[in-house]
């Protein structure tokens, strides 16, 4: 079972200054339209090769367009022993600010 969080809950955590780890797994052209400012971009296809960059002691919130790809990534990483949360509804439901990808 994958833990879930709503976009509104993520926005609230950011507004409260909580130190949360966000990973956006969308493709480059999707992220070019805007990304949550604190999110790190790792494309879904790159996750297996880049999982070593993640700390198993931290909890990561995964984001995609609708919540489906991020759920798959979260399930994959949970099996590897990572602490994961899926942002349900994805960027389609995100009402907060986005910034251009750096």
Region roles according to the model:
Residues 1-20, 27-59, 68-102:
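Rhodanese-like catalytic fold shared by cysteine-dependent sulfurtransferases
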Residues 63:
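Short, surface-exposed ligand- or partner-binding patches at beta-edge/loop junctions that are enriched
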């Amino acid at each position: 079972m994958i833990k879930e969080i709503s976009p509104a809950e993520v926005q609230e955590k950011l507004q409260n200054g909580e130190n949360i780890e966000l990973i956006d797994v969308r493709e480059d052209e999707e992220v070019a339209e805007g990304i949550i400012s604190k999110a790190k971009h790792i494309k879904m296809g790159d996750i297996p090769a880049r999982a070593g960059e993640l700390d198993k002691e931290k909890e990561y919130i995964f984001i995609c367009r609708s919540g489906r790809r991020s759920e798959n990534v979260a399930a994959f990483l949970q099996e590897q022993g990572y602490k994961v949360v899926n942002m349900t509804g994805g960027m389609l439901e995100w009402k907060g600010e986005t910034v251009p990808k750096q």
